Amino acid sequence: GVIYASLAGIFWGMAGIASEYLFQDQHVTVYWMMGVKMSLSALTLLGLAYYLDGKKIFLVFKSFKDILGIVLFSILGLAGVQFTYSMTVNYSNATVATIIQTLGILPVIFYSAIIFKQLPGRKQWIATITALIGAWLLVTKGSFNQLAISKEAIIWGIFLMLTQAGNSVLPVDLLRRHNPTTISAWAMLVGGIVFEFIHPVWKSVPKFTPAITLNMLFLIFIGTALSYYLFVKSLHLISATEATLLDTFEPLTAALLDFLIFK
C-alpha cells in the first residue's frame, strides 16, 4: 500500500509538469483535455478490470448505493481533483498546485477524527503543521502584506484541497465490496462523460505536434490511468490518512522537474 501510494504521487507529480506544458506553453484548454484524458483512461481501466474480473465489473450496478457512491466519488473526488488541479496549474504552475493539493490531508484528518474517532498521531501532526507552514510561505513568500500567487489560483487551490480529501475518503466504502480497478474505471468514465457534455472533444481541438502528443499520451495513460489505479489500490491496503500523507511525493517530484525543465 505504501509503495502504491508513493508511486501514484510520483506519477502525478510528473503529470503536473506535462499539464503545465500543455496548458501554459501549448494553450491546450483544460476542459478539452479533461474529457479526453478521463474517457481514454476509463476505457483503459475498464479493459483491465474486465480482463481481471470479467462480468463482475457490472456488479456495482446492482446496488443504488454503489452507483451513487461511484458518482459522488467521481464528481467530488477523482474527476473533481483532476479538474481543480488542472485549473490551479493553469493559473499558477505544477509546483504550486501540488503543494496546495497536499493540504487535502487536513480535512482527511478531521474526517477520520470525527467519523472513526482516530486522532492524529505525532507524525501526522508534524506533517500537518509542516504542510500549513509550507502553504503559507508559498502563498505569501513570508510577507503578511502581499500574495505571491493569483487570487484565481488560491480559489481553485481551496477546491483542490477539498476534492483531494474527497478523492481519499469517498472510495473507501466501495473498496470493501469491489475491486479497486473496477471502482477507478467506472468513476473515471463518469468524469469523462460529464466533461464531454461540458466541452465536446471536437471543440477547440489543439494542433498536434510530436511533443504535444507524447505529453498527452503520458498524461492519459501514466499520469491518470496508472496513477489512479495505484492510488485507489493503496486505499484498499492502508488508511486514507496514510495514503494522503504519502502523496507528498507529488510536490517533491513536480518541484524537481519544474526546476530542471522550466528554469
Where in this protein do the model-derived segments appear?
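Glycine-/small-residue-enriched transmembrane alpha-helix faces in small-molecule transporters
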Residues: 1-35, 146-173, 193
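Cytoplasmic-side transmembrane-helix entry/capping segments in multi-pass membrane proteins
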Residues: 2-6, 63-72, 120-132, 153, ...
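Helix-helix packing/entry segments at the starts of transmembrane helices
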Residues: 9, 36, 78, 82, ...
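Membrane-interface helix termini and inter-helical loops of multi-pass transporters
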Residues: 17-30, 56-60, 87-90, 139-152, ...
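Hydrophobic/aromatic residues within transmembrane alpha-helices
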Residues: 22, 33, 88, 114-120, ...
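Transmembrane alpha-helices of multi-pass small-molecule transport proteins
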Residues: 26-80, 107, 111, 163-170, ...
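Hydrophobic transmembrane alpha-helices of multi-pass small-molecule transport proteins
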Residues: 45, 111, 120-142, 195, ...
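Specific transmembrane alpha-helical segments of multi-pass solute transporters/efflux pumps
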Residues: 50-95, 101, 137, 220-238
